[in-house]
Amino acid sequence: MADLKKTPLYGEHVAAGAKMVEFGGWLMPVQYSSIIEEHQRVRNCAGLFDVSHMGEITIKGPDALALVQKLLTNDADRATGDRVIYSPMCYPDGGVVDDLLVYPRGEGEYLLVVNAGNIDKDFAWIQENASGFRVEVSNISAATAQLALQGPRALEILRPLTRVDLASLGYYRWTEGQVLGVHCLISRTGYTGEDGFELYFEAAAAPTMWRNILAAGREAGLVPAGLGARDTLRLEAALPLYGHELGPDISPLEAGLHRFVRLEKGEFNGREALAAQREAGVRRQLVGLTMIDRGIPRPEYPVLAAGKEIGYVTSGSLAPTLGQNIALALVAAGTVSTGGEVEVSIRGRVNRARVVKLPFYRRPKK
């Protein structure tokens, strides 16, 4: 594990007794108490995640918008003012380089937040595509920490720690301001299916911020949460994970991300391939499964219909909120329908599952 990267909060995690695991080249906390307990705390109260392993790349210059438009399938013209956008970033053949968040940082500047295991690849890809554009591309990941405060009590916990009017900050909106005396980019975003905030700030401040936010939220029930709970939370919300629901061989259309593919915006990497897919129809589709028989479906387990293999599980787990075993699966288009039954081969045994509408979980409206 000596070659694995560590976030600025590594010492905090070890001191708290977290179980550390390898993830995308990083040594990260998978859990502190238990995955189920941390999961339920986020659903019912709040959890604080160290997501400093995520990457941050800036694009600055007169041609910044033009380059971002070339890179993204979504329309970067929609990332204006305080609006954050989510987008896949594709290869010319329609496969996915990565999926990311985009923050407009003023005239001619964008912040791209990329997945931890893809930082170097994404940075090289963006630099390659920047040839001929009047831009400066910088990888600021090592200098940037990121915390995610997630759950229905996130606003209640964070509001006393800043003068920023967080209550009026809409979902997928961002602002800047001081939190506990540290300058932060504050974003009302997350990867759990719950309300919450993601904070970006200088890496040196991470240990103090971590300790002080946890202390401030303790009476409200805030706990540190690891990557295990983050994964079960995002799976219940049917949020894709790169390398599972997205990848070089899985297009955004196959993954069900149609609304983030804006063919009408003009040329971008992968547009021709994705336009052809949309016209002809995708060969595969992402579906949700709840297990009828016992057994937890795991990635790459075969999915069958009438005894014939039609696809495979991309992600699967016990869903603590639902008390069921669930999965996302990539299957041949047109072979299943919502409410129908399929089978998952789990260690050579056939287990029945039902095709369900996604997401598995949607947070209650207030």
Curated annotation (Swiss-Prot):
Its EC number is 2.1.2.10. GO terms for molecular function: aminomethyltransferase activity; transaminase activity. One of its GO terms (cellular component) is cytosol. GO terms for biological process: glycine decarboxylation via glycine cleavage system. Pfam families: GCV_T, GCV_T_C. The keyword Transmembrane helix does not apply. InterPro entries: GCS_T, GCS_T_bac, GCST_C, GCV_T_N, GcvT/YgfZ/DmdA, GcvT/YgfZ_C, TrmE/GcvT_dom1. The keyword Transferase applies. It is an enzyme of class 2 (transferase). Keywords: Aminotransferase, Transferase. It catalyses: N(6)-[(R)-S(8)-aminomethyldihydrolipoyl]-L-lysyl-[protein] + (6S)-5,6,7,8-tetrahydrofolate = N(6)-[(R)-dihydrolipoyl]-L-lysyl-[protein] + (6R)-5,10-methylene-5,6,7,8-tetrahydrofolate + NH4(+). NCBIfam families: gcvT, PRK00389.1. The glycine cleavage system catalyzes the degradation of glycine. Belongs to the GcvT family. The glycine cleavage system is composed of four proteins: P, T, L and H. This is Aminomethyltransferase. It comes from Moorella thermoacetica (strain ATCC 39073 / JCM 9320). The lineage of its organism: Bacteria, Bacillati, Bacillota, Clostridia, Moorellales. The gene is gcvT.
